[in-house]
């Protein structure tokens, strides 16, 4: 959502391999912050083995398992918990898991043990790192797809969800999803040491999440999508007010004349750590998302905006994509806007440009 720090250039390359029953995906990145040396990094996105036994299929390793309906937000994405609306679409880093699935002509059942290695009593560093058991049941009934979900997390306990997607006409598709959680994980400023990140993932009370959406596709490959959702696991308005107050206090401290260099560096570090809670699936609890697109032969043009009614903040994106047999080129621009009191106006980066070239071989 928030993009790279100001003045930062990044290059990414994604490599995939498939050998017998083993699949792998590796992401190579090179990041060059303004005025600093380039940093290279390699990360295994997926590495898992598949097997079959009767009507069941099994996967073991690090794998992406994405559930639920919806584009801008997915309440029942209880395994992968993938970041949505990213500027560049790459394979996310899968979760360590053991997956068992069975398929019928119109049904499917999936059972997952995710993050089995995470058995600590303290809350995980991110919500997606929690050890949990999850299950999904899927049924297709004509033009309607039905989903039921259940999850038991080590820290968040029980959650139940349901989703439906219905192709109402040749041009119109409707979808909805809802989830109730006994507990949820959220960022809280719990630390006090000046040399440590004060933000910690903490267990909070019950939360509800839901999404309503519609997608229209025209005869000339033009499309319009509208989604409205509530994310009860996002920080509430009072929490963001405290976040802004802390931002202001740190900026005022950094501007004090005669502040020692050591203290100034400490304040700069605290300001950098203020970006920690910005990585959630939703910044505000209530959101409206609109996306328009048009495809003609090898070209696809798209525009979308995420609107947050709480403070009238907006995140808008325009993109153009050209695709041939082996190449896909993408140019995109994202802008964060809104009035001065909007959360998006306080974020460190307001504009992000992207050029991506993908070669399949």
Outline where the language-model segments fall.
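Residues that define the transmembrane beta-barrel architecture of outer-membrane proteins
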Residues: 5-13, 40-45, 92-96, 103, ...
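Outer-envelope beta-barrel architecture signal
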Residues: 9-11, 18-24, 54-56, 96, ...
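Outer membrane beta-barrel
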Residues: 16-116, 338
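Outer-membrane beta-barrel "beta-signal"
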Residues: 290, 327-329, 335, 347-361
């Amino acid at each position: 959502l928030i993009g790279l720090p100001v003045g930062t250039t990044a290059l990414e390359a994604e490599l995939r391999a498939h050998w017998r029953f083993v699949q792998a995906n590796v992401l190579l990145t090179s990041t060059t912050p303004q005025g600093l040396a380039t940093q290279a990094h390699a990360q295994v996105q997926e590495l898992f083995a598949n097997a079959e036994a009767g009507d069941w299929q099994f996967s073991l390793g690090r794998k992406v398992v994405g559930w639920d309906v919806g584009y801008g937000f997915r309440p029942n994405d209880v395994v992968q918990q993938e970041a949505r609306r990213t500027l560049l679409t790459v394979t996310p880093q899968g979760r360590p898991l053991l997956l068992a699935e069975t398929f019928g002509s119109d049904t499917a059942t999936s059972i997952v043990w995710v993050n089995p290695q995470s058995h600590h009593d303290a809350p995980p560093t991110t919500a997606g790192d929690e050890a949990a058991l999850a299950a999904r049941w899927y049924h297709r009934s004509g033009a309607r797809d039905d989903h039921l979900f259940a999850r038991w997390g080590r820290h968040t306990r029980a959650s139940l969800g349901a989703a439906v997607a219905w192709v109402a006409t040749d041009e119109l598709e409707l979808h909805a999803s809802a989830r109730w959680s006994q507990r949820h994980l959220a960022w809280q400023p719990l630390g006090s040491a000046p040399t440590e990140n004060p933000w910690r993932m903490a267990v909070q009370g019950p939360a509800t999440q839901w999404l309503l959406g519609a997608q229209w596709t025209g005869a000339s490959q033009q499309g319009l999508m509208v989604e409205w959702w509530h994310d009860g696991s996002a920080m509430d308005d009072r929490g963001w007010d405290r976040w802004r107050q802390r931002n202001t206090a740190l900026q005022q401290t950094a501007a004090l004349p005669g502040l020692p260099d050591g203290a100034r560096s400490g304040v700069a570090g605290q300001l950098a750590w203020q970006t920690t809670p910005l990585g959630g699936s939703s910044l505000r609890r209530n959101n409206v998302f609109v996306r328009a697109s048009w495809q003609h032969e090898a070209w696809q043009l798209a525009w979308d905006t995420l609107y947050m009614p709480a403070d009238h903040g907006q995140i808008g994106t325009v993109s153009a994509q050209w695709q041939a047999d082996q190449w896909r080129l993408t140019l995109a621009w994202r802008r964060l806007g809104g009035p001065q009191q909007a959360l998006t106006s306080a974020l460190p980066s307001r504009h992000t440009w992207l050029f991506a070239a993908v070669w399949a071989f």
